[in-house]
């Protein structure tokens, strides 16, 4: 699924760089916060999905594997106790 999202993003926004994607991520996080403040579950789900898409697109821009990063972070957090 991640590769499909990265491919879609490259086709849809061919001139976007990592900073463009980062700015979009910040925008989507703000929209998630607004949805959470209104406590509307459907909007929260949609905005959380948008945040995830931005994270996947950003990982593609940075040539990093998001799944591997999550696994590494989870392992680090488990070791903290």
Regions found by a protein language model. Name each.
Residues 1-48, 52-81:
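Flexible "arm" and connector segments at domain edges
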